[in-house]
Design a protein with these regions (language model features):
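Gram-negative outer-membrane beta-barrel transporters
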Residues: 169, 416, 529-537, 553-639, ...
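Extracytoplasmic beta-strand/coil segments of soluble accessory domains associated
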Residues: 74-114
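C-terminal beta-signal and adjacent terminal beta-strands/loops
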Residues: 215, 484, 576, 618, ...
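Transmembrane beta-barrel wall of Gram-negative outer-membrane proteins
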Residues: 182-213, 217-265, 298, 362, ...
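Flexible loop and strand-edge segments within Gram-negative outer membrane beta-barrel domains
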Residues: 212-216, 224, 228-234, 248-311, ...
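Short acidic/polar hinge/loop motifs at secondary-structure boundaries
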Residues: 110-138, 192
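Membrane-embedded beta-barrel scaffold of Gram-negative outer-membrane proteins
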Residues: 312-333, 467-487, 505-560, 565-569, ...
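A beta-strand signature from Gram-negative outer-membrane beta-barrel systems
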Residues: 128-167, 710
Length: 711
């Protein structure tokens, strides 16, 4: 214990101060190059170090390398994002909050999160092959409206990078667990991209098809297929077209299609919490069951941009839409825990969005020492969401929200090194709830017929930040921001016990986020950064279990913690780094004291990540990554020794990944090994859920060979 504390103290001292990319972005990149990262998710294009916020940027090179280890986006984000838990090794990302609260997931600014009824699939809405880079802004924010009480994750799709009429690349990948069971563990991926430009027109077309093998743990046992990622086939198509009317104006169209469904011969078996894992065995599914997964996720936008539309003012307008249909696992009727009027069934979520954004950015020069950018505009979003069963019954009826929001954001630069940010957004949301009957659990339960109506939400959110960048060795920032969320409204309505909408607790969650941090560069060999944060909400968003079902805990909550990072260039061809993130969440009880903890669903154990990036010779790379998550033991079992869901003990995890590659002219060859040491362990999610059926292990050693040919 003393050695562990000493090591942690040394890391905190040397790292001293924010976000960190677990894997080196490029072994020959210098800290100066890393500093010049421009982000756009804050709605004002700016350097990451000037954003007065903790920002993680995962660039295209890093995505290309990490996706060989983690082709599933939720897995990739869990490995490289401080403040986020490791992935669950399932299709669900429920336990992957951002700093203990829900994040708003965007694809090119199009919301993927479904606040009217959460899918917990927000991070599995696009394939990594279509992604150029990812911008993660941490802390509560209302820059894009409802849902970002933990932060924003904006996934930016690829675009043409060629100056020829036709260029392209073909990628083939194969993976295997075959050290254990031949014929069952193989997977493959194929990606084809074509891109180029001719005259004023540029384009990119990308298509991906992949299939994973059966998931196998470190002992060679098939992992339970419940919500599993094994035996899934994935399809993704991205089309992007751009036309430049002039050097200053451009029209761009994007369309992305994503599908991921499970097709397995395995069925779940066994599972005893903290005793034996839930496994997969070959068997026959219930004939009523259909393939689980995301049948489709369509996203599209049409965007017009104009620089200097009028004096010193840029303009951007976009129309966008999305359509999602995802199906959950089949649940056989269980007399001990009945649902859906004591019948079997399979629920799904259907979600549609249409919206537009208009934004003006004006540049002001007030004096030789003072300049400013003023961003102002208007957002509109129409969102329809329902949770039907595949047999046609509705668990949650179609809810329709209408969201209008004017906003303004000002960033002033004083003496070129003092940056002041101030902004506000006023959201007007009307949710139309139809008359509906609550789908009872038991036939003998009283039928509740809810009289529908309109739920109205008006919310004003502010943000203010200050950053100081005169000295590279110490670039501090301080920030305050607010966010709000209509947190999983459908979950509340489907369990309604009152017949009048006004009697049902549907208040939104509002958060205040305070943060202080700094970026630092020492010479051209050392980067340090870090932040400390505190978030408070009068109404909570943590989930708790009541009568076998999840409900929202509305008691006040606070989350506080820190992120620390250090990157060091040891030699020109050798780089290393480490990152630690830790935070805690408390609930204010009826006693008026903060003497209860938020569940493990929201608050993960501390996470430490370290890497070494080595370039043996030119055009090669060797990356070794180590991940450690700590223990979280905050809750006691009941008299029978049973934990509430979400309150199970989370034990430590140690994980090592290897990534190596070589470039030979037009070829890029790679070898990746996830779980290099073939560690047999349970996922954090399986431990915290504390339920037999979900007590499943993580994947064992998996080897992937990748070949990319560019032309």
């Amino acid at each position: 214990m003393k050695k562990r504390k000493a090591s942690l103290s040394l890391l905190m001292f040397t790292a001293c101060v924010s976000p960190f990319s677990v894997l080196a972005e490029n072994a020959i990149e210098t800290p100066q190059q890393l500093k010049e990262v421009v982000i756009t998710t804050t709605r004002i294009p700016e350097l990451k170090t000037n954003a007065a916020a903790t920002v993680t940027v995962i660039d295209q090179k890093q995505i290309a390398e990490m996706s060989k280890i983690a082709p599933d986006l939720s897995h990739l984000l869990g490995l490289v994002t401080p403040g986020m838990a490791l992935a669950s090794n399932t299709t669900s990302s429920r336990t992957q909050s951002l700093r203990g609260r829900s994040a708003l997931i965007l694809i090119d600014g199009i919301p993927q999160s479904t606040p009217l009824r959460s899918t917990d699939r927000d991070m599995r809405t696009i394939d990594v092959s279509a992604i150029d880079h990812i911008e993660i802004v941490k802390g509560s924010t209302a820059l894009y409206g409802n849902g970002a009480i933990g932060g924003l994750i904006n996934i930016i799709t690829k675009k043409n990078a060629s100056h020829t009429i036709v260029s392209g690349q073909t990628t083939l990948a194969g993976s295997t667990y075959d050290f254990f069971r031949k014929g069952k563990g193989q997977g493959y991926r194929i990606n084809q991209q074509l891109y180029g430009n001719t005259g004023n027109l540029d384009y990119l077309v990308s298509g991906t098809f992949g299939r994973t093998g059966s998931s196998i743990d470190g002992d060679g046992e098939f992992i339970s297929p419940r919500y599993g990622l094994g035996d899934t086939y994935t399809t993704n198509t991205l089309v992007k077209l751009g036309y430049a009317f002039s050097e200053k104006s451009r029209l761009e169209f994007m369309y992305n299609f994503y599908r991921s469904l499970q097709d397995t011969k395995l069925i779940p078996q066994g599972g005893k919490y903290m005793r034996e894992p839930a496994i997969g065995v070959i068997g026959n599914k219930d004939p009523q069951a259909v393939e689980e997964g995301t049948r489709y996720n369509h996203n599209a936008y049409l965007k017009f941009t104009s620089r200097d539309l009028f004096r010193n003012t840029n303009f951007e307008a976009s129309l966008y839409g999305s359509s999602l249909y995802t199906i959950f696992d089949f649940r056989k009727a269980n007399p001990k825990s009945p649902r859906w009027e004591e019948t079997s069934g399979q629920s799904s979520i259907k979600d549609k969005k249409w919206g537009f954004r208009t934004q003006f950015t004006s540049r002001l020069t007030l004096s030789d020492d003072v300049s400013a950018h003023v961003v102002y505009g208007y957002d509109y979003l129409l969102n329809k969401t329902a949770q039907p069963l595949v047999d046609g019954r509705y668990w949650v009826p179609f809810l329709t929200s209408y969201n209008h929001a004017p906003f303004v954001q000002v960033k002033a630069s004083i003496w070129q090194w003092l940056n002041v940010k101030l902004g506000g957004r006023y959201d007007i949301i009307n949710v139309d709830v139809p008359d509906y009957n609550v789908l009872r659990n038991k036939l003998k339960d009283p039928q509740v017929a809810v009289k529908g109506g309109d739920l109205k939400y008006n919310n004003m959110s502010f943000n203010v930040g200050l950053s100081y960048n005169k000295y590279r060795v110490f670039q501090p920032f301080v920030a305050f921001s607010q966010g709000f969320s209509i947190f999983d409204l459908g979950r509340t309505l489907r369990a309604a016990k009152a017949d009048v909408l006004s009697k049902i607790s549907t208040e939104p969650v509002k958060t205040n986020n305070y943060e202080v941090g700094a970026y630092s560069e020492v010479g051209n060999w050392l980067q340090l950064n870090g932040s400390f944060f505190y978030t408070y909400s009068k109404l909570g968003s943590d989930l708790k279990i009541e009568n076998g079902f999840w409900v929202v805990n509305r008691t006040p909550q606070k989350v506080y913690g820190m992120e620390l990072n250090a990157d060091v260039k040891i030699l020109e061809n050798l780089k290393a780094g480490a990152n630690i993130s830790w935070f805690e969440g408390k609930i204010k009880t009826e006693t008026g004291k903060w003497d209860s903890y938020m569940s493990n669903i929201s608050i993960p154990a501390a996470k430490l990540a370290m890497y070494i990036n080595y370039v043996p010779v030119k055009n090669t790379y060797l990356n070794l990554q180590y991940i450690h998550t700590g223990k979280r033991d905050r809750f006691a079992p009941d008299a029978k020794g049973v934990y509430n869901e979400g309150e199970g003990v989370v034990n430590r995890i140690n994980l090592v990944n290897l990534n190596a590659g070589i470039k030979l002219k037009a070829w890029d060859l790679g070898l990746s090994v996830s779980n290099l040491l073939n560690n047999t362990y349970y996922t954090s999610t399986s431990m915290l859920m504390a339920r037999n059926a979900e007590f499943a292990r993580a994947d064992g050693r998996n080897i992937t060979f990748t070949a990319t040919f560019k032309y």
